[in-house]
Amino acid sequence: MGNTCVGPSISKNGFFQSVSTVLWKARQDGDDALPGANGAPDGGGQGRLPAPPPPTSDAPLAVQNKPPEHVKIVSTTDTASAEQDASKSSAGSDSGEAARPRPRVPPVKRVSSAGLLVGSVLKRKTESLKDKYSLGRKLGQGQFGTTYLCVERATGKEFACKSILKRKLVTDDDVEDVRREIQIMYHLAGHPNVISIRGAYEDAVAVHLVMELCAGGELFDRIVQKGHYTERKAAELARVIVGVVEVCHSMGVMHRDLKPENFLFADQTEEAALKTIDFGLSIFFRPGQVFTDVVGSPYYVAPEVLKKKYGQEADVWSAGVIIYILLCGVPPFWAENEQGIFEEVLHGRLDFQSEPWPSISEGAKDLVRRMLVRDPKKRLTAHEVLRHPWVQVGGLAPDKPLDSAVLSRMKQFSAMNKLKKMALRVIAENLSEDEIAGLKEMFKMIDTDNSGQITFEELKVGLKKVGANLQESEIYALMQAADVDNSGTIDYGEFIAATLHMNKIEREDHLFAAFQYFDKDGSGYITADELQLACEEFGLGDVQLEEMIREVDEDNDGRIDYNEFVAMMQKPTMGLPAKKSGGLQNSFSIGFREALRMS
């Protein structure tokens, strides 16, 4: 199962300025009373939760790392409940984005047997996974499952195993999505640039997909690592990417989530094949069939998808965006938040004037223009793209190096600044009871099953209670922004971090306490080793530590001091030049507070 049309890595810290003053004003008018812990309106009918008293300077920083009045739900597993994130996994799944938005007709139909009966998802009895494979270390984590290294007992050969917890498959659609993903992987099996599936297994706890192990790293990482990059190489990669799209379309499959994170190299060798992974959002289609559900990832989503009327042409648009990035290092349509990105996708102009475009061949620019035509009827098909002179073997793509700035931009674009989100989580977990009393009540109000985890459905209902009229894709984006560990749910600590008022984040004692959390040895600096340890504690594996440090390290000494740390917390989204001014107001927590109609 894949990502929804939600937060890109570099825009997660700036979100939804559009749901702001209007929502708060409506709350002031008292139209929607916010329920308290027992479901009744709080605050004497004013519709507000009790405001936390102002913090005192000597307030203890008691760690709040458990949900309030946590009631453990009986579960058949302690296995992690998130699907593989492509940027961290060697077999690949999506980048840590939330479950895909698709319209639901209330009430939601529950699949009561999915987490209890063997064969309830695959509809057949399978061999035991553990009889054939031994599971090793975790490779990656996403919304619905976790990917592990697994070794075939009979041969000792290594594979990747994506385990999807059945208790996460809440609706009939969720179950059908898993079945379809498996069917599509088998349907496309044998293509050299599509990840191969070894087998599917099911037990009472999870569905397990054993697939080819892709240990060669992500597309952009390999390019940056090599350091030498030419337009001809970009054309070669474009040929592979569009070739996969053509094969999918010829076999009646639309991928619907093409992005660089979903392309991994099979191994570390120079001649390693580039593989397409993660078919969680893919779907079978017939010629002329029209789809309406909004899925994908913001930078790569086609305009007709946002308009909820699209076909297979949307994949060509996504491939065109990837080629644009391969040539210049940044996406063609971007903004500081998801809403802005969607506006740019719908109405923005392609930039061929900024560097390095003046030095890029006219053939490359012609191809990109024709792939990024907003009218899908006028857009090139995948087959037509492969016939374009710039893409063809021995074609027009020159063998001259691209500007070195392309590599640095690409590296910035592909690396998430996870440090800031981890720091916000640390601050949230070190607030006193008084400081978060109101937020605790709000968490209890939304977490209706007292599981200690807010699901998408619970968040949707909670937002409706407070009068926030958001689209499903917007709610998924809020989930994405708050879900630091990519588990597909928002736990107590993540919720507090996402709803903190800026005056708490700016307090010196909170910033210093967060800095000390990362500065394990008390040296006054956060080193790469300390950052690696923190990432492991947060369940974030295979992150680009050097790039995370480089984004913050102003004096280029390879480590982060306290002043640099504070500056990071006060800056808007990193990675691309800011299109809008702003400081802490651009934090991802603002979008959550506004949606919940908080001050």
Curated annotation (Swiss-Prot):
Region annotation (Disordered) maps to: 27-110
Which stretches does the entry tag as region Autoinhibitory domain?
A: 397-427
Q: Respond yes or no to whether keyword Cell inner membrane is given for this record.
A: no
What subcellular compartments does it reside in? Answer: Membrane
Q: Which UniProt keywords apply?
A: ATP-binding, Calcium, Kinase, Lipoprotein, Membrane, Metal-binding, Myristate, Nucleotide-binding, Repeat, Serine/threonine-protein kinase, Transferase
What positions does the entry give for Ca(2+) 3 binding? 519, 521, 523, 525, 530
Q: What CDD domains does the database record attribute to this sequence?
A: EFh, STKc_CAMK
Spell out the Low complexity composition-biased ranges: 87-98
Q: Where do Polar residues bias regions lie?
A: 74-84
Q: Can you tell me which residues bind ATP?
A: 139-147, 162
List lipidated residues, N-myristoyl glycine: 2
Look up the record and give one Gene Ontology term from the biological process aspect.
intracellular signal transduction
Keyword Zinc-finger in annotation: no
Q: Where is the active site?
A: 257
Q: Where is the EF-hand domain?
A: 434-469, 470-505, 506-541, 544-575
Fill in the domain comment.
There are 3 contiguous domains conserved in the CDPK subfamily: a kinase domain, an autoinhibitory (junction) domain and a calmodulin-like domain. The autoinhibitory domain (397-427) inactivates kinase activity under calcium-free conditions.
Which named protein is this? Calcium-dependent protein kinase 10
Q: Which family does it belong to?
A: Belongs to the protein kinase superfamily. Ser/Thr protein kinase family. CDPK subfamily.
